[in-house]
Amino acid sequence: MLLIAILEQKVTGKQARQSWRQLLWKYGEPAPGPAPEGMRVFPDADIWRRVPSWEWHAAGVGPQRADTVMRAVKVAASLERTLALGRGGPTVERALRSIPGVGVWTSAETTQRAHGDPDSPSVGDYHLPALVGWALIGKPVDDDGMLELLEPWRGHRQRIMRLIENSGFAKPRFGPRLTIEDHRGR
């Protein structure tokens, strides 16, 4: 889950999913047993360690994110032991954030997915603070404003954010959408 969160850093969700799909298709193995066609198994840390830099580039993953993944897979065994600690918390966050390139947002995204932490809000997300602000008070807010709005739900802040995201509510749009640039051919 950490690897997926790293791939999602500073890019659109569409770009991250394309990168993940390409890497998983190339380095994952077919799922065992009866499984849908094309389903792949997440590669282990040893396989990720052997992915050459040009494959990351070909998948649209820049050098900073690829380097962060490489640092993470070097300590994969110790990170996997954090799963026994339960639903996140300071010890898990410190372990994740000890890896250069893993910050507050990546740590929160990882503890949400891998640890099932219901209270790790994604601080630093490009869209979420404004979405939460528009949904709860009718205007955009920054990270601090989002945390203030979510405070009554401490213990479940991440769940509230996901409920808002999945409710169908959409914040107002004021301009054109971001054009996704493809730098892989350069």
Predicted feature locations:
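HhH-family (HhH-GPD) DNA N-glycosylase catalytic core used in base-excision repair
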Residues: 1-186
